[in-house]
């Protein structure tokens, strides 16, 4: 854990990585870790499919398939994380690739439950994965006693093997049932929600930070329902690691993306970055730093039926705190930005 005495307001951070780490074998290990994460869904699904070609595996595959159909652990918020996996070296390599660093502005009471709000979404929220779904950025050292579950779409849990991999990293469904279950288990159990969602990913551009937040009230209602505190988190640099094909609302690409989002619940950003073996073009993210500043919690009383006014007031306070993080640290972490923070509905 590194003390950030030179940055006002930050009391501790993920240790910075050595510059030499990008000039030796670790440079390639970092790239390999990011590549394997990028293709993890395809690899796990393919591995499962290939096994069906071998008759001796059929009894095991059939049993697994039945279990896959009936198991609802990802919806009910069951804790199936494997600490050894979250602490595995590849996730540290993953975080060092960019690098991804967490910055703490206050201590969090491990006797409380928290809803971490992650902004911006970026293309695929790689900072959220590295910083919160693994120990690659030392989350547990910075926030001892806080057990955070990163939340994602239900559709990710319908892929054989991949869904078990996600749950082993403490990644669960973003459904209401899952959220309430996790936040009601025991003190310290918390969730991370990428609040802008699919719509915000379509706005991701290097140098820009466009958030879809003004009409997102679900996470505030969840805070009231469970009595959880809200913690705004701003990931400076999340939008800079991929470029996106022009998709302004007048283009056919945007219209196609909107249709997919309405049908499937997620969208398909057409993005590009660098290659695994080249720095010019590919689907690998660029090596640009992602600095995640974790703000101060907003305590929310437990209420089954809060008034609209109470919801609006907490929502406004959350936005105020988030904008405060942006204004305080934008010149520290994004000195070369091309635009200021923009919030939309």
Curated annotation (Swiss-Prot):
Coiled coil: none
Topology versus the membrane: Multi-pass membrane protein
S-S bonds: none
CDD domains, alphabetized: LPLAT_MGAT-like
Keywords, sorted A to Z: Acyltransferase, Endoplasmic reticulum, Glycerol metabolism, Lipid biosynthesis, Lipid droplet, Lipid metabolism, Membrane, Transferase, Transmembrane, Transmembrane helix
GO cellular component: cortical endoplasmic reticulum; cytoplasm; endoplasmic reticulum; endoplasmic reticulum membrane; lipid droplet; perinuclear endoplasmic reticulum
Record keyword Ribosomal protein present: no
A Pfam family it matches: DAGAT
TM region(s), chain numbering: 50-70, 114-134, 142-162, 217-237
Residue intervals on the Lumenal side: 71-113, 163-216
Observed effect of gene inactivation: Has reduced whole-cell and lipid droplet (LD) TAG levels. Cells lacking both TAG synthase genes (plh1 and dga1) have no LDs and exhibit defects in spore germination and in spore wall integrity.
Cytoplasmic side: 1-49, 135-141, 238-345
Record has NADP as a keyword: no
A GO term, aspect molecular function: 2-acylglycerol O-acyltransferase activity
A biological-process GO annotation: diacylglycerol metabolic process
Family, similarity comment: Belongs to the diacylglycerol acyltransferase family.
Function: Catalyzes the terminal and only committed step in triacylglycerol (TAG) synthesis by using diacylglycerol (DAG) and fatty acyl-CoA as substrates. Required for storage lipid synthesis. Major DAG esterifying enzyme in stationary phase when TAG production is particularly active. Involved in lipid particle synthesis from the endoplasmic reticulum, promoting localized TAG production at discrete ER subdomains.
Identification of the protein by name: Diacylglycerol O-acyltransferase 1
Organism whose genome encodes this protein: Schizosaccharomyces pombe (strain 972 / ATCC 24843) (Fission yeast)
Gene: dga1
